[in-house]
Regions:
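NUDIX/MutT-family hydrolases
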Residues: 86-88, 97-129
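C-terminal alpha-helix
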Residues: 130-137
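Hydrophobic pocket-lining residues within nucleotide cofactor-binding pockets
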Residues: 36, 91, 112
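N-terminal strand-loop-strand
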Residues: 1-32
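Active-site segment of metal-dependent pyrophosphate-handling enzymes
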Residues: 55-95
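Short aromatic/basic micro-patch
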Residues: 30, 81, 109
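The catalytic Nudix box helix
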Residues: 31-66
């Protein structure tokens, strides 16, 4: 069991049928996300992280689901559990600006099938599938 729990929020951003992904400093393909702080809501944090990490102004359509993972924090010297709420989002265009200053190595919009293959973690692939199903009307929306 993790000694420290971090509640996080992130965005699964679609522009048309394309999905925005970032490559982090470990060369993992991920979606924008961050820790919920300062009494902000999960929705606020998800929108903020999408804008801060990718320069994308998106709107939330629905909650896509939740994931969690544990890791050992070298700096904290204890195990940490990240619990993430993911939101299906739509951007009006394909414009973006990668926040290289936050350690990201790359990022872009990719066709859905390519994005599914690129994502490093299976949990992220499942959330992407769920978000797409919500956005195409193939799954019920639920928050």
């Amino acid at each position: 069991m993790a000694e420290h729990i971090r509640n996080c929020a992130g965005g699964v951003v679609f522009a048309g049928d394309d999905v925005f992904l970032l490559k982090n400093d470990k060369s993992e393909w991920i979606m924008p996300k961050g820790v919920i702080r300062d009494r902000r809501s999960a929705r606020e944090v998800a929108l903020y992280r999408v804008e801060a990490e990718a320069g994308i102004e998106a709107e939330i359509v629905a909650l896509a689901g939740r994931t969690s993972y544990d890791f050992y924090s070298q700096s904290r010297r204890k195990s940490v559990s990240n619990r993430i709420q993911w939101f299906a989002m739509r951007a009006s265009d394909h414009r973006y600006r990668i926040a290289f200053e936050h350690g990201f190595l790359d990022g872009d919009y990719f066709p859905y099938e390519v994005a599914v293959r690129l994502l490093t973690h299976e949990q992220d692939r499942e959330i992407l599938r769920r978000a797409r199903a919500i956005l195409t009307g193939e799954a019920p929306q639920g928050e």
